[in-house]
């Protein structure tokens, strides 16, 4: 058995039940949860990101939530600079760490040692890209850096702008600047992929709207402007349309469900291609996960 410390990553598409299982695992193992959900890194974005509630955060310590305001974008490099010391601290103290999230690129960067381009935020460029609109920006990226564009959804405003930002600021495509330096950890990937995911997505979407997604979106728009890139993401974009009167609540819910299903499909594809998780069977998730963890701990 290797003496290297163990990093457990709990991954799966949105609405697959990661939060509930993470809380149980964290309590059983006496660990905090290290967040690897890109939208939960931002303050004030609580309902729309299904961020762990205050009660859940009181139950189990969570790291890497609420790092910045929504108008202060976090690059992958900056996220790694926050996350890596957090992981190393847990490994030093406990010999084990628990990462939880559905942001595949962020997980991959941490577990494989991907080193993204060292290009800082470029606010003026981002303003220009926002003014151009995603319908122009993604094709522009596809023409200039097709490798990067192929890995980014045409609807993903934040990552599209980041790839263009790197390209324009450095003069080199983002796809050609990344390198890999594997970390000195063992990785155990546990995957959730429930057969009833469509139903779970529908139920969670209804719950987000009941919990105040529309009101949260209005507060964010009032404070940061409706053109905030994060307000174009799933759920927030539809809530904006409710607030400006261009869509009904039921139509917004239906669109959010559809966009979430499409996103979950892309997540599943990413996890199959980029990760090698031990898929949990849905029967007794906690027992099965603990058995796998104990086997790796020896």
Swiss-Prot record:
Catalytic reaction equation(s): adenosine(37) in tRNA + dimethylallyl diphosphate = N(6)-dimethylallyladenosine(37) in tRNA + diphosphate
Residues carrying the site annotation Interaction with substrate tRNA: 103
Source organism superkingdom: Bacteria
Cofactors that this protein relies on: Mg(2+)
Single annotated GO MF: tRNA dimethylallyltransferase activity
Keyword Ion transport on entry: no
EC number: 2.5.1.75
Family according to the record: Belongs to the IPP transferase family.
Protein name: tRNA dimethylallyltransferase
Gene field: miaA
């Amino acid at each position: 058995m290797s003496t290297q410390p163990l990093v457990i990553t709990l991954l799966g598409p949105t609405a697959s039940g990661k939060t509930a299982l993470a809380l149980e695992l964290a309590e059983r193992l006496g660990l905090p949860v290290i967040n690897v959900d890109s939208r939960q890194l931002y303050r004030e974005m609580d309902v729309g990101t299904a961020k762990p509630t205050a009660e859940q955060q009181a139950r189990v310590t969570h790291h890497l939530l609420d790092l910045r305001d929504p108008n202060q974008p976090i690059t992958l490099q900056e996220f790694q600079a926050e996350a890596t010391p957090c992981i190393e601290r847990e490994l030093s103290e406990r010999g084990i760490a628990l990462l939880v999230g559905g942001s595949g690129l962020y997980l991959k960067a941490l577990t494989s040692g991907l080193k993204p381009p060292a290009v800082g935020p470029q606010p003026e460029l981002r303003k220009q890209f926002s003014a151009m609109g995603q319908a122009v920006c993604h094709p522009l990226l596809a023409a200039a850096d097709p490798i990067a564009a192929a890995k980014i959804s045409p609807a993903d405003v934040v990552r599209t702008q980041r790839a263009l930002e790197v390209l324009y600021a450095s003069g080199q495509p983002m796809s050609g600047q990344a390198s890999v330096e594997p970390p000195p950890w063992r990785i155990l990937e546990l995957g959730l992929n429930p057969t009833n995911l469509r139903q779970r997505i529908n139920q969670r979407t209804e719950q987000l709207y009941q919990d105040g997604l529309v009101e949260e979106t209005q507060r964010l728009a009032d404070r940061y402007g409706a053109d905030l890139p994060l307000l174009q993401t799933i759920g927030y974009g539809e809530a904006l349309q409710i607030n400006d009167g261009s869509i009904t609540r039921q139509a917004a819910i239906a669109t959010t469900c559809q966009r979430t299903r499409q996103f979950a499909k892309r997540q599943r594809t990413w996890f199959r291609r980029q990760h090698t998780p031990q898929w949990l069977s849905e029967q007794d998730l906690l027992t099965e996960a603990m058995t796998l963890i104990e086997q790796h701990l020896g």
